[in-house]
């Protein structure tokens, strides 16, 4: 009887330990829902013009030290992959009353920018890669700002409004840099 009780207790303790490992900490919630929006800032047409004007470099296949500029399409595709990955992680966070508004706002923000990256940002990248004129690129950037910048800023600002007191409450040190 004593052996059975001990085995049951150990099984219960291990189960409790394993389930507690699946509960994100406040810092996990904050990092995924708020801090990772750094991946999508700055956002908008003017920001896109600046980021695409000076493309990053990549290693030339088969070499260890030779680089070549990335196409703008590659830059946008990389951005799309990062936003999709971040969105998947945010959606996987367990629901909690304390974090619900913050997490839902972050999801809305990611879901807001994703179609813009897949649409207008790709079009802007194509203008760069295929030699579109500066006038065409500026017009596309202005279109992005006109259509999306206000919505982005509203969601972003709301997320920061929710994130600041959450970080303070849980002693998460954050450099807000004027936000």
Language model regions located:
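Short, solvent-exposed, charged loop/turn and helix-capping segments
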Residues: 85-108
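Amphipathic alpha-helix face/heptad-repeat signature
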Residues: 29-41, 72-79, 102-112, 148-151, ...
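Extracytoplasmic electrostatic interaction patches
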Residues: 101-179
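Secondary-structure edge/capping motif, primarily at the C-terminal ends of alpha-helices
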Residues: 50-67, 90-97, 120-135, 166
